[in-house]
Design a protein with these regions (language model features):
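Conserved ABC ATPase "signature" region
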Residues: 41-59
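Conserved ABC ATPase signature
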Residues: 63-67, 71
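Catalytic Walker B motif of ABC-type/P-loop ATPase nucleotide-binding domains
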Residues: 88-91
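H-loop/switch region of ABC-family ATPase nucleotide-binding domains
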Residues: 120-121
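ABC-family nucleotide-binding domains
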Residues: 98
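Hydrophobic anchor residue at the start of the ABC signature
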Residues: 77-78, 105
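Conserved beta-strand-loop-alpha-helix hinge in the C-terminal portion
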Residues: 138-165
Length: 165
């Protein structure tokens, strides 16, 4: 049943603008619990608690269209986590983020006990957040050795910022 699956798996879209549609952050995060049958007070409490857990306390009345890209991505994640899914499906969660926002996403994901399927081209990110890897070749999934997510220090030509992956 697709409805049952939607209640168990949270989807974080690549572009946060496609996921956020309410005027304020609190309304966006409370939308899911309201649709699950929570009262207004329960939905607001769950939303506020989730925002606090993600370091977004104080964002409740902020306008979603005025958030930075990283803030929008974190709020998108909050809209999913507030529903307490059994698993997460994340599509390119670090795409277009500044390094600080990327690190916040990594920090949040590393603390979650929730099973995750992450679609990403960012091997550094995958190395920090995942233990198993699959690659897509044509229409087939293939096990990727963890060596794809290797660890060594280097400097990217455009970033000129040493990091490990």
């Amino acid at each position: 049943d697709f409805r049952e699956l939607r209640c168990k798996v949270g989807l974080v879209l690549q572009h946060a603008e496609d996921q956020l549609f309410c005027p304020t952050v609190l309304e966006d995060v409370a939308f899911g619990p309201l649709n699950l049958g929570c009262t207004q007070d329960e939905a607001r409490d769950r939303a506020a608690s989730t925002l606090e857990r993600l370091g977004l306390a104080g964002f409740e009345n902020r306008l979603t269209h005025r958030l930075s890209g990283g803030e929008k991505k974190l709020v998108s994640l909050a809209t999913v986590l507030v529903m307490e899914p059994e698993a997460l499906l994340l599509d390119e969660p670090t795409n277009g983020l500044v390094p600080e926002a990327r690190q916040r996403i990594i920090g949040v994901l590393k603390t979650l006990p929730t099973a995750r399927i992450i679609i990403s081209h960012d091997w550094d990110f995958l190395a920090e957040t995942s233990s198993e890897y699959l690659t897509v070749e044509g229409q087939h999934f293939t096990d990727a050795a963890p060596s794809h997510a290797h660890a060594h220090m280097h400097v990217h030509p455009l970033g000129n910022k040493p990091h490990e992956h």
